[in-house]
């Protein structure tokens, strides 16, 4: 017996997946998803894999997660959407991918539309 529980194993896998999303390592992240990791998995703050990829500007990772069925409007515990995060960080390619996939620019608090107005992002 190794002394490591299934719960601890899953926690380590989840943390690795969150790091992969945050750093834009798309191929490795998608191997986790293809092996059965929930595409809408969230961390302790309610940030999904998609939210982390969007907030850190990884458009290819965002597109891959969307292709795997990620919820483009899933908000975190602070009611922030992936689209609002991308707008806040001024990641136009990420925002475009989310909008193309049907993300709601009025979802969340503040919404992506409100965030764009606050920061003069006239591209939304």
Label each region the model flagged.
Residues 1-35, 44:
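Intrinsically disordered, low-complexity regulatory segments in ankyrin-centric signaling systems
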Residues 28, 60-61, 93-94, 122-124:
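Conserved ankyrin/ankyrin-like repeat signature
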């Amino acid at each position: 017996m190794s002394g490591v529980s299934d719960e601890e194993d899953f926690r380590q896998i989840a943390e690795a997946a969150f790091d992969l999303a945050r750093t834009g390592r798309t191929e490795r992240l998608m191997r986790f998803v293809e092996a059965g990791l929930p595409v809408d998995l969230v961390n302790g703050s309610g940030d999904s894999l998609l939210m982390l990829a969007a907030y850190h500007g990884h458009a290819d990772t965002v597109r891959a997660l969307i292709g795997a069925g990620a919820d483009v409007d899933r908000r975190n515990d602070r009611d922030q959407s992936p689209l609002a995060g991308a707008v806040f960080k001024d990641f136009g390619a990420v925002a475009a991918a989310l909008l193309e996939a049907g993300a709601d620019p009025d979802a969340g608090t503040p919404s992506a539309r409100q965030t764009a107005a606050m920061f003069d992002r006239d591209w939304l």
